[in-house]
């Protein structure tokens, strides 16, 4: 709320200009309001120890879960928001009442799906492609995540294994296709593919960075990262394998490539396939970072099964939700919050994990 000092400052502006006319004085007051950083930014200063005020906590709750100012019910309880259980009750209420768009935004940001509508495929290789394909795929992804969080109260294992409805996808492109879990979403396949076909390295980096929160070093200076254009003399795996054999690249690619190659049974549009250019698809792979050696699993579904039970995947989901809801990166002081969110995501539900951030003490503090 506006404090006395702010009101007094605006009153001084008005009083100073009032002799020159009412309209000019009022215009100056409005200009001062519009130029204030508080008009553009949600500024949360807290007290000397970084603890937020009751109204700052109310703002954080409402913007984290509904992306809007606090409603009447939240303001009526503002003096009780120091109680974790009260914050949790309001977080769950806000998610249920107005949080569907917030959840869709979170998943799009986490999984890097923003702007997918502009993705296009090479018409020479995918003549069946149209602008409707990425649009419908994004709608399918939104509906999948919304159903998991709000309708099923699904957990981390469900995120990687639940059946994905394909009703809204263009039938001329996806006739007879079935999808299970986030790794089989066509939207994800397109977002990590080239217009001419799949990109195993992009897919492997995506899994490591976005789903496991691993840090990948950039390519060494002077390394050519371009891949030879596709032709029918070699499969995508063969072309990318040759590219990654450079000794300067092997330290990272030994972690990246096995993941990307396991996803090769899904084409650039996310459709299941068993061959490319008439040659069998080799979708053997692994996740060396998790101790799953290269060659020990085959295909997207097998990879999904491993990630579904990996503690690292649960922690990574928790880290991304903490970043999204608090608007900052996590630090070592957030370790117990991340563990609690990950535990709830695995043992109870994704929604419960989302609510858990509001119940944690870190939600009531400004980190410096």
What is each model feature region?
Residues 3-7, 40-46, 73-76, 118-123, ...:
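Short, solvent-exposed loop/turn and secondary-structure capping segments
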Residues 3-8, 42, 50-105, 119-123:
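Extended, well-ordered alpha-helical scaffold/bundle regions in very large, multi-domain proteins
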Residues 8-19, 77-96, 127-133, 338-347:
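Amphipathic alpha-helical segments that form the core helices of the histone-fold
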Residues 22-30, 51-57, 352-353:
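Alpha-helical scaffolds flanking conserved acidic
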Residues 27-38, 42, 65, 89-254, ...:
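Extended surface/linker regions that mediate inter-domain or inter-protein docking
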